[in-house]
C-alpha cells in the first residue's frame, strides 16, 4: 500500500497574523512528526506522519498557505480499541457488595475458548497477547490461535512459563513475535511453527479459538483491535 500525502490548506484572518505565522513556523517544521485528528458525527480517527512542507504566501492581500504531510502508514485509526479476551476464570467482582444474604458471583469458570472480534473498518492486522498463569513453572506448551472462519492459524512452538508474556503483532510492515520473561524481551519469531499465518481481521465478525498441546486453561489471551480505514 502506498504512503498517503495529506495537504491542508489554510487562511489567516484578523489581527496578529505575523505573530501567528511565526508560531506556526515553530511547530510545523519539515521532517517533524505530526498527528492528525479527523472527527465527524459518525467517525473519530487519527493518522500519523511527518511534515513535508509548510508554504505560506504572506505578500498577498490575504495570508494563506498549505501544509503537506507524508504518512508512511496510509490508514486512519479509530481513537478507541476493542479487546477480546480468554481466561479460564472470568472475574465477577462488583462493588458495592450486595446487602442481602443471597449468593452472588465473584468469579466463574469459562468453558468456552472462542473469542469474537468485530471489525468495523477495513481488513487489518491486530495485536495478540498470550500470558502464562499457573502454579507450576510451565503454564502451557505449543499454544495456537485458530481463525474459525478461514482455518488459518498461528502457533508458537515450545513452553510458555508462568509469568511469560508473548506479544504478536500481525500488521503489515510491523510483524513481530516478542517474549517477555522476567523483564527481558526477546524476539522469538523463529518459534512460529511452519504453516502459521499472520492472522488478520476481515470486515465484520471474526471468530478465533485456542488450542495447546498442554495447559490451555493456564493461558490468558487477548486480541486487541483498532478499526482502520483507508478512506474517511
Pin down the residues of each PLM region.
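Solvent-exposed loop and beta-edge segments used for protein-protein assembly and interaction
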Residues: 1-4, 28-30, 59-63, 120-124, ...
Amino acid at each position: 500500500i502506498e504512503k498517503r500525502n495529506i495537504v491542508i490548506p489554510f487562511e489567516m484572518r484578523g489581527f496578529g497574523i505575523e505573530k501567528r505565522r511565526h508560531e506556526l513556523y515553530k511547530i510545523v517544521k519539515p521532517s517533524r512528526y505530526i498527528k492528525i485528528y479527523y472527527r465527524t458525527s459518525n467517525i473519530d480517527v487519527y493518522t500519523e506522519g511527518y511534515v513535508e512542507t509548510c508554504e505560506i504566501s504572506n505578500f498577498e492581500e490575504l495570508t494563506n498557505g498549505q501544509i503537506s504531510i507524508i504518512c508512511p502508514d496510509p490508514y486512519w485509526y479509530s481513537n478507541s480499541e476493542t479487546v477480546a479476551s480468554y481466561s479460564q476464570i472470568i472475574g465477577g467482582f462488583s462493588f458495592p457488595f450486595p446487602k442481602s444474604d443471597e449468593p452472588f458471583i465473584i468469579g466463574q469458570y469459562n468453558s468456552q475458548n472462542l473469542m469474537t472480534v468485530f471489525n468495523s473498518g477495513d481488513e487489518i492486522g491486530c495485536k495478540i497477547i498470550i500470558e502464562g498463569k499457573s502454579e507450576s513453572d510451565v503454564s502451557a506448551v505449543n499454544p495456537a490461535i485458530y481463525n474459525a472462519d478461514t482455518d488459518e492459524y498461528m502457533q508458537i512452538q515450545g513452553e510458555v512459563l508462568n509469568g511469560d508474556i508473548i506479544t504478536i503483532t500481525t500488521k503489515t510492515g510491523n510483524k513481530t513475535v516478542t517474549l517477555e520473561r522476567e523483564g527481558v524481551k526477546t524476539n522469538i519469531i523463529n518459534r512460529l511453527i511452519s504453516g502459521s499465518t499472520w492472522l488478520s481481521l476481515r470486515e465484520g465478525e471474526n471468530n478465533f479459538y485456542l488450542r495447546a498441546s498442554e495447559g490451555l486453561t493456564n493461558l490468558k489471551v487477548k486480541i486487541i483491535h483498532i478499526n482502520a480505514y483507508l478512506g474517511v
